[in-house]
């Protein structure tokens, strides 16, 4: 009986660690896909890493420090972003100070993504606002699936400033006349868009022709 009890405990432990590892794997892959779609230089080799390869590299209990990602923008070398995976504990203001000091000591970045597994305190959120660059917060559960790949989601394309200007001129309208898209929309957060940026949204239906609309982030 004692032996069986031990076997159950061990099995449960292995299962729990496997789930944890798989969660990190999925979230990191989605994050790299997200960076690539934003124009950052991320290799296909990193994105296509299998779960087995991920386990071989990082183990069943990955060290979050080793999961960090840094990438430069393909078309603007002055833009560099870092991704930091926070641990399972509550993120307090002291943790934010440590992250800030560590990131800034390593590299000169223009953006930071924090992947959270637990609650972040109000004081820590206030500390985030003091950073000199844009900081984005994502729950790890929001990154287990790539929202841009959902079969029911229409195709989204981010317009650059020139394309936006041409659009407004073509239809003789002002930015405020465009349909709005909330800054909290998952696809807006995925692309890291700012207020005023415009997305081209293409809807496709098997029974009808594709329909295109433009929406402005508010």
From Swiss-Prot:
Keywords: DNA-directed RNA polymerase, Nucleus, Transcription. It is found in: Nucleus. Gene3D superfamilies: RNA polymerase, Rpb5, N-terminal domain, RPB5-like RNA polymerase subunit. InterPro entries: Arch_Rpo5/euc_Rpb5, RNA_pol_Rpb5_N, RNA_pol_Rpb5_N_sf, RNA_pol_subH/Rpb5_C, RPB5-like_sf. One of its GO terms (biological process) is DNA-templated transcription. GO terms for molecular function: DNA binding; DNA-directed RNA polymerase activity. It comes from the Eukaryota. Its main location: nucleus. The keyword Transport does not apply. Expressed inleaves, flower buds, flowers and siliques. GO terms for cellular component: RNA polymerase IV complex; RNA polymerase V complex. Signal peptide: none annotated. Belongs to the archaeal Rpo5/eukaryotic RPB5 RNA polymerase subunit family. Component of the RNA polymerase IV and V complexes. Interacts with NRPD1. DNA-dependent RNA polymerase catalyzes the transcription of DNA into RNA using the four ribonucleoside triphosphates as substrates. Component of RNA polymerases IV and V which mediate short-interfering RNAs (siRNA) accumulation and subsequent RNA-directed DNA methylation-dependent (RdDM) transcriptional gene silencing (TGS) of endogenous repeated sequences, including transposable elements. This is DNA-directed RNA polymerases IV and V subunit 5B.
